[in-house]
Amino acid sequence: MMNRLINEQDGRNYSAKPDSSAAGSQENENTIELTVPDNLAGLRLDQALAQLLPQWSRSRLQGWIEQKCVSVDSAAATCKQKVWGGESIRVIAGQTENDQSHQAEAIPLKILFEDDHLIIIDKPAGLVVHPGNGNWHGTLLNALLNHAPQLSQVPRAGIVHRLDKDTTGLLVVAKTIEAQFDLARQLQQRTVKRHYLALVLGKLEKDGVVDAPIGRHPIHRTRMAVVQNGKPARTHYRVLEKFTASTLLHCSLETGRTHQIRVHLLSIGHPLAGDPVYGRTSPDPSTADAVVRLPRQALHAWQLELTHPHSGQILLWESPLPDDMAALLQAIRNLPHSSVSRPL
């Protein structure tokens, strides 16, 4: 586990000021001002905002427009009105009724770093990040509201990206709307570096890249799949350790689609060990007993690197393997066959 300063970008300001493609500023921590870039000309206002403010869902943005929290060139706006480039948009980023219904709950959190702008969480298995789909309580969002009550004023309690319920490891949370806006831009521009450790079934011989679009499974709507009309998704993987019937990988993301690593690795015939949804392939008998000991997918968000939204410093955190994955790997290493490893 570490919090390490890599370097400082001299003269670079990473506060919530969009770049030349969407120039803007923040009047206060609840107000965002943007200039519509020319490349969005012809879009509806809600469509343009969905691209400029990807940290918030389109339905949320539409709600703000309908509540008169969005103006275009100082005039009231509608969702359907077109933008043509150059307009000044002002957004008052308020709460929705759904935000206000979430309750603070005293759930322990493992916090690796916290200041006035960020919280870095080391998430355990079993913790849902955001309420929904039958998990309305006991989530990371509920825990954050208890830990830092001021997050009730930040949409989604500052959450800007997610991990699946049973994926462990590092998450960043923004403590202000300004920080949330900046972190979302970093994610959109793919400058946030997210690295994972994954144990997959079967032996992979070479490093590789999976570049395949991901969308809803055409039949099983609660699952994701590689589909032709899905959203672009790209996952890099590097072989760290090879066993007779499984492989330890270092995975890194260029995009952040739902279940991306799980779906991409399944698509190349190597599902995650223990995955209850995408790991339908039976493990090799030589490792079956060890894999069965892990009641979840063997996926850990090991490393997170980002630019601090206020100071401009590039920061890196690492999280050690959780006990269950470490025990699984040790059990496999103890089996009577050799492995080949290389350093991270």
UniProtKB/Swiss-Prot annotation:
Subcellular location, principal: cytoplasm
Subcellular location: Cytoplasm
Entry keyword set: Cytoplasm, Isomerase, RNA-binding, rRNA processing
Any one GO molecular function term: 23S rRNA pseudouridine(1911/1915/1917) synthase activity
Annotated region described as Disordered, given as residue ranges: 1-29
InterPro entries associated with the record: PsdUridine_synth_cat_dom_sf (IPR020103), PsdUridine_synth_RluA-like_CS (IPR006224), PsdUridine_synth_RluC/D (IPR006225), PsdUridine_synth_RsuA/RluA (IPR006145), RluA_PseudoU_synthase (IPR050188), S4_RNA-bd_sf (IPR036986)
Catalytic activity entry: uridine(1911/1915/1917) in 23S rRNA = pseudouridine(1911/1915/1917) in 23S rRNA
GO biological process assignments: enzyme-directed rRNA pseudouridine synthesis
Active site residues according to the UniProt entry: 164
Span of domain S4 RNA-binding: 43-116
GO annotation, cellular component aspect: cytoplasm
Annotated EC: 5.4.99.23
Physiological role: Responsible for synthesis of pseudouridine from uracil at positions 1911, 1915 and 1917 in 23S ribosomal RNA.
Protein family according to the UniProt entry: Belongs to the pseudouridine synthase RluA family.
Name under which the protein is recorded: Ribosomal large subunit pseudouridine synthase D
Gene that specifies this protein: rluD
